[in-house]
């Protein structure tokens, strides 16, 4: 089973396209929607929904994946639920770059201070990070610097921030999922 979390643009047709691409490596792809506007509510909702779909599945190796803000949540929720994560161009600091776009961006900072101390050290090797060199939203050299001590980082030479096409990374995802 692959759990897919959308980014900030929850209505993008690219979400459906990514789900179709993910179905090439796993028939069971679950899309979990969340508001993107209320971080504390989103965290509670995502924890509940992800836990529920894990319980419903008989897959011994489920993974959670997301793009942008969905990558932010995939890393945290996957860690808290004990499953591996694959993140594409994750937004590591929504408390800084979502100001004016969501109601309470400061809640992301509050979530970070209440999260398990040094969770990335405890999650080491359980997240695959795919970063685009052509990301027009974030400086992914900073993202790589923040994550490379904990996770494998794969660079993509073509895709933009929204990562419309993930098919070139599906076999790496499948191998990571089943390892």
Curated annotation (Swiss-Prot):
Q: What is this protein called?
A: UPF0227 protein VS_2073
Q: Which domain of life is it from?
A: Bacteria
State the family it belongs to: Belongs to the UPF0227 family.
| InterPro entries the record matches | AB_hydrolase_fold, UPF0227, UPF0227/Esterase_YqiA
Q: What is the species listed in this Swiss-Prot or TrEMBL entry? A: Vibrio atlanticus (strain LGP32)
